[in-house]
A protein has these predicted regions:
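Conserved, well-structured core segments that form or line functional sites
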Residues: 109-113, 120-132, 139, 143, ...
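Conserved beta-sheet core of the metallophosphoesterase superfamily
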Residues: 13-14, 30-42, 54-64, 132-202
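Binuclear metal-dependent hydrolase catalytic cores centered on His/Asp/Glu-rich metal-binding motifs
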Residues: 73-122
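Divalent metal-coordination and catalytic microenvironments
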Residues: 40, 90, 124, 153, ...
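Binuclear metal-dependent phosphoesterase catalytic core
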Residues: 67-68, 73-89, 161-234
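Single conserved hydrophobic/aromatic residue that forms the stacking wall/gate
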Residues: 1-9
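Active-site beta-strand/loop signature of hydrolases that rely on acidic residues for catalysis
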Residues: 10-19, 40-43, 124-127
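Extended active-site neighborhood of metal-dependent phosphoesterases/phosphodiesterases
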Residues: 33, 39, 44-89
Length: 234
């Protein structure tokens, strides 16, 4: 059924910019969850909308980057109990080319330890980052200690899905779900004018045919390692 199909495709989905404009609202989060997603991860626009603050502090299955300041609403790790195994999902934000934030390399070790101490046999990281080198380095840093790490933020799917030497599934960026003929989801003409003139421009979402992008990681439940990866684009 639809629920089983969604679970096969993904246990988590990045909900960044699901609200009109950017950020996320409680109603857009509920819409994503109603589609069958088990958990929503976020990124650098997590706190853009104040309406989401109480929702982030609730028990709803939504997390924001774990390396946000401790005063920020929400949490950065979630344990999903599927019955047959526990899956930990960790959300991190990169420090290169984005707003100042605690170094993700300084917090990930304790997060992995926390996931394992709570019985998670599978650990997945959503690394919301701009710099490809930072994403790649993080992949190698956690290789063998987590099941899979996927990058988000650039809205552009990369073609480097792979299994790292110690069994961790990796992709630099899973892409976006949104209008195919667009500039990262934004209407083409305003984006061109902004880049051409350098003048303030009001961006609007593009309409038209949409694409769903992502990456499927096949993970062995016993070893917690990725055995196969496949790009998704529909």
């Amino acid at each position: 059924d639809r629920r089983q199909r969604q679970m096969c495709i993904r246990d988590s989905a990045n909900g960044e910019n699901s609200a009109v404009g950017n950020g996320i609202l409680p109603q857009s989060a509920e819409y994503i969850l109603d589609c069958g997603v088990d958990l929503i991860t976020l990124g650098n626009h997590s706190l853009k909308r104040k309406e989401i603050y109480d929702y982030l502090d609730s028990s709803a299955p939504i997390i924001r980057p774990a390396n946000y300041h401790s005063s920020a609403p929400g949490r950065g790790i979630e344990i999903i109990d599927k019955g047959y195994c526990k899956i930990a999902v960790i959300n991190l934000q990169g420090a290169v080319y984005l707003d100042p934030i605690e170094n993700p390399f300084s917090v990930i070790d304790s997060l992995i330890d926390k996931a394992k101490s709570e019985g998670a046999g599978i650990i997945i990281i959503d690394f919301h980052a701009e710099a490809t080198a930072e994403k790649k380095a993080m992949g190698f840093y956690v290789d063998g200690r987590v099941s899979a790490i996927f990058g988000t933020h650039t809205h552009t799917q990369t073609n480097d899905n792979q299994i790292l030497p110690n069994g961790t599934g990796y992709i630099t960026d899973i892409g976006m779900t949104g209008p195919y003929y667009s500039v990262l989801g934004v209407a083409v003409e305003p984006a061109i004018q902004k880049l051409k003139t350098g003048l303030p421009t009001r961006f609007i979402n593009e309409d038209g045919v949409c694409t769903l992008e992502g990456c499927l990681f096949e993970i062995d439940e016993k070893s917690g390692k990725t055995v196969n990866t496949k790009l998704i684009r529909r």
